[in-house]
């Protein structure tokens, strides 16, 4: 009998582990799924209770009936408590982003799309939309920064044919890469996020209607591991905050090695690295540098972050390639959405910081971030103070464009 009960418990655990994330939560939500589970347990308890009802004392009977009645009254009032809690956290953090446009509960996270409330402060905010995952403000609608994540590395590839974007976000990098007329894959672990683009993007057909674009719901690292072909450009934008558990898996030396393995001989990798935590940034940059023999670093257009480009071959920006790209109407239209008139030589020189020589002088003695040393995920133990990182002036150099 004990073995039979143990077998039933194991079967129930397995079935519950499959049913909850893939059926119950997507169909009826987290709160209702909990209620269903509790209801099943109560039903079993009542069956057992009825078997001994005849021999129960009056106090026990009235107490049981009272508890059932109380639960019947209170349970319906708590069906939306999880949703309400997430909304409360979000509104406190960003008061002007209080209009909820979408709420999706998935197998591994809850995703909410917010929009500004129309106040003067909100209208002045460039980030009109914001996606929060489990109440964490991970994705903002910032076109300038995210468009550079596609255009900047593609400018450094002589004749690109195929690109990969890891992390869909608001879809801006994916859309921008498609304007180059190449095949573009995008991989995101969260199946709810790409669908939200149909709400927040001004022209969703550019994202979902381009035959050269392909959206894959999969972990970016696993996708790289199993990718059937090589790419001329791979760009990765880890969703902030960078110390989120598991995010080190797409910022480690081993991950960057996978990126390198899936690049063509002259392919370029691009990683957007936030420089808000001194020590964490250097470890991530060291992991990138340990893989790529050639590295270029550019300032982020708006944030305290860097666009880091890496390749197995020397990275060169040519005037001919720049002119070729800027002659494409779709590219110019895409840049115009972010208020950028042109990716001129002057702009590239302004954003440029240094190459691998400057990086090497900075990283002396710095241990790279690796899978078995995920130091990004232990920020609390190292203190919560944010120490902004910046490159020393003596590592800055001038960007030389070839003809």
Per-region residue spans from a language model:
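Membrane-embedded alpha-helical segments of integral membrane proteins
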Residues: 1-51
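Composition- and surface-driven signal marking solvent-exposed, interaction-prone regions
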Residues: 2-3, 19-21, 30-39, 134, ...
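The AdoMet/dcAdoMet-binding core of the Class I SAM-like
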Residues: 125-126, 136, 140-285, 289-292
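Generic beta-strand/beta-sheet core signal
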Residues: 5-9, 26, 36, 114-116, ...
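Active-site-proximal structural scaffolding
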Residues: 1-4, 12, 16, 35-39, ...
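Soluble small-group transferase modules, centered on the S-adenosyl donor enzyme superfamily
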Residues: 56-157, 162-164, 203, 219-226, ...
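Short, well-ordered loop/turn and helix-capping segments at boundaries between secondary-structure elements
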Residues: 17-20, 25, 45-52, 155, ...
């Amino acid at each position: 009998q004990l073995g039979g009960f143990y077998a039933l418990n194991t079967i129930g655990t397995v079935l519950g582990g499959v049913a909850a994330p893939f059926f119950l939560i997507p169909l009826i939500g987290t709160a209702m799924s909990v209620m269903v589970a509790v209801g099943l347990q109560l039903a079993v308890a009542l069956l057992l209770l009825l078997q001994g009802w005849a021999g129960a004392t009056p106090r026990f009977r009235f107490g049981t009936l009272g508890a059932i009645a109380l639960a019947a009254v209170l349970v319906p009032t708590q069906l939306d408590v999880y949703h309400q809690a997430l909304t409360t956290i979000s509104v406190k953090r960003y008061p002007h982003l209080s209009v909820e446009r979408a709420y999706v509960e998935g197998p591994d996270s809850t995703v909410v799309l917010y929009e500004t409330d129309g106040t003067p402060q909100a209208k002045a905010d460039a980030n009109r939309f914001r996606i929060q995952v489990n109440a964490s403000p991970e994705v903002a609608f910032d076109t300038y920064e995210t468009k550079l994540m596609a255009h900047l590395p593609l400018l450094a590839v002589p004749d690109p044919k195929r690109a990969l974007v890891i992390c869909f976000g608001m879809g801006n990098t994916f859309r921008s890469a498609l304007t180059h007329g190449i095949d573009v894959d995008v991989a995101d672990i969260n199946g709810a996020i790409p669908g939200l683009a149909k709400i927040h993007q001004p022209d969703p057909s550019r994202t979902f209607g381009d035959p050269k674009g392909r959206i894959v719901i999969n972990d970016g690292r696993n996708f790289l591991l199993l990718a059937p072909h090589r790419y001329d450009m791979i760009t990765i934008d880890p969703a902030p905050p960078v110390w989120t558990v598991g995010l080190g898996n797409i910022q480690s030396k081993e991950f960057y090695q996978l990126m390198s393995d899936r690049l063509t001989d002259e392919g370029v990798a691009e990683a957007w690295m936030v420089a808000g935590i001194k020590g964490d940034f250097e470890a991530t940059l060291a992991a990138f540098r340990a893989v790529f023999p050639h590295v270029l670093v550019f300032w982020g257009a708006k944030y305290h972050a860097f666009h880091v480009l890496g390749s197995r071959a020397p990275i060169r920006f040519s005037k001919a390639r720049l002119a070729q790209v800027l002659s494409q109407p779709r590219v110019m239209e895409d840049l115009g959405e972010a208020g950028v008139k042109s990716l001129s030589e002057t702009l590239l020189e302004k954003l440029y910081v240094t190459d691998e020589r400057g990086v090497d002088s900075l990283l002396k003695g710095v241990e790279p971030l690796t899978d078995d040393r995920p130091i990004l995920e232990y920020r609390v133990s190292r203190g919560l103070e944010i120490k902004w990182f910046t490159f020393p002036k003596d590592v800055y150099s001038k960007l030389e464009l070839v003809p």
